A protein has these predicted regions:
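The feature captures the beta-strand-to-loop junction immediately N-terminal to the Walker
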Residues: 66-68
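Helix-to-loop junction immediately C-terminal to a conserved catalytic motif
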Residues: 81
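Conserved ABC ATPase "signature" region
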Residues: 128-146
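Conserved ABC ATPase signature
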Residues: 150-154, 158
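Hydrophobic anchor residue at the start of the ABC signature
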Residues: 164
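Catalytic Walker B motif of ABC-type/P-loop ATPase nucleotide-binding domains
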Residues: 175-179
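Conserved beta-strand-loop-alpha-helix hinge in the C-terminal portion
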Residues: 232-253
Length: 253
């Protein structure tokens, strides 16, 4: 996904990330976390990015989508969050959603970890409630004690975990992660992947993560995986099975 200006990112985090999409789209057609029903989208230049695309995520978990550049993955994410509107078809989200960008520097806007997380918390909470929520999020993402830490001193993996915490600060329970480990070293990749998987399998309050990847080795951690091609998504299958079918490696950029 292309980078976005900081002013637009701020608006996205405050308004779109915690947006309840149900009233904007359709009544619940299925008991699903996310349901995309025959959605099509054509760009002004005539390119058909999505072509009667359908998918259903039926329960919380880590769900991965693979596909070459131009297959429609990022367009789908923009439609789910409401940055774009379907031209044909419909989308239903049971949970409020938030985007996590490939490059956390495009998402982290303020100097310190704590102040950046404050930006995403609903303003109707007291300052004491907001501070406690910041500490809880930092602890949850393995960033304990870093509320006053300058963001520019963090590693790439720490920045990405802070970006995920920022998405959760808005009370989003559906995370849309657009190649979140693409810029990370192997250790950072493993840490971010394991952190998201733990969030998805939390015994009390699990989240749903919809994760775009070019790294097929990551599929082994998925609860389900699918391939996107020419604006359509294939059936869900197990991550290892899809990885074997695609012979492991990386899609061409």
């Amino acid at each position: 996904m292309r980078s976005l200006p900081s002013s637009f990112t701020r608006k996205l985090r405050r308004q779109v990330a915690a947006n309840d999409r149900v009233s904007q789209l359709i009544p619940d057609p299925v008991n699903a976390e996310l349901h995309v029903d025959s959605v099509s989208y054509q760009w002004p230049n005539g390119h058909h990015s999505l072509n009667r695309c359908s998918l259903t995520i039926s329960k919380p978990g880590l769900w991965m989508l693979v596909g070459s550049n131009g297959s429609g993955k990022s367009t789908l994410f923009r439609l789910v969050t409401g940055l774009l509107q379907p031209q044909v078809g419909s989308i239903y989200c049971q949970r409020s959603s938030a985007l996590v960008f490939q490059n956390p520097d495009h998402q982290l806007l303020l100097p310190s970890c704590g102040s950046d997380l404050m930006l995403g918390i609903r303003p109707n909470q007291s300052m004491d409630q907001r501070r406690k929520k910041v500490e809880a999020l930092l602890n949850q993402l393995g960033l304990h004690g870093l509320a006053k830490r300058p963001i520019h001193t963090l590693s790439g993996g720490q920045k990405q975990r802070l970006a995920i915490a920022g998405a959760l600060a808005s009370d989003a329970r559906l995370l849309l992660l657009d190649e979140p480990t693409a810029l990370l070293d192997p250790q950072g990749q493993r840490t971010v992947l394991n952190t998201v998987r733990e969030l998805c399998h939390d015994p009390v309050k699990p989240i749903t993560a919809f994760w775009i990847t070019h790294r097929l080795d990551e599929l082994s951690q998925a609860d389900g995986a699918a391939q996107m091609s020419m604006g359509r998504i294939g059936p869900w299958t197990s991550g290892p099975e899809l990885g074997q079918r695609l012979q492991f490696g990386r899609f061409s950029k």
